[in-house]
């Protein structure tokens, strides 16, 4: 199951709304989207049904009724469980220094931060991170192409590379979820999805005002993939999003 599901890329709409020039239009049209008819159907279901009637109300409740220290702490626990996955993937990339940032974050926040409820590790500048590292990004770092765009019901946007990465990441964590119980995995991903959506509530209208929300979201998704594969170093283009925006997309 995806760590953060529908509309976690909403903030990207800020830089993508409006009319594109000829060069931009050409680049957009060259995206690998051979399943566009199917994808648009799934997009409408996710956006008009799942988000509108499930995620958005849950996100509003998360913001309005859950005290900030509690919501941040619960999200911290969920995110802390991704650190071992990032540690392994960084080692596969031959990046031991970055790998041990995740390793140290995990044990420090687990032992001293009540399982990640408090992010003690980020008190050290050297242990602060912007994104976790999935196996999909690891494949991308070795030059594996993302592949065709796919929109699945509830799961939302993905590609063959990212789906493969999600399966491998899940395999890393399988023994843990077997130990604590599978339903807790759903709780983890649910908390991350609602927390991510809650952070983007104020930007929903920007996506609705886009000339083609489907294209807007698709471009944001591909830019986000490139951003994460390159560790926050994005090749500049007329459609590129600011770094501070991309850091909030996961």
Curated annotation (Swiss-Prot):
PROSITE patterns listed in its UniProt record: PROKAR_LIPOPROTEIN
S-diacylglycerol cysteine lipid modification positions: 19
Subcellular location as annotated: Cell outer membrane
InterPro entries: MlaA (IPR007428)
Signal peptide residues on this chain, from the entry's feature table: 1-18
One Gene Ontology cellular component annotation held by this UniProt entry: cell outer membrane
UniProt membrane topology term: Lipid-anchor
Function recorded in the entry: Involved in a phospholipid transport pathway that maintains lipid asymmetry in the outer membrane by retrograde trafficking of phospholipids from the outer membrane to the inner membrane.
Family: Belongs to the MlaA family.
Protein name (Swiss-Prot/TrEMBL): Intermembrane phospholipid transport system lipoprotein MlaA
Lineage: Bacteria, Pseudomonadati, Pseudomonadota, Gammaproteobacteria, Pasteurellales
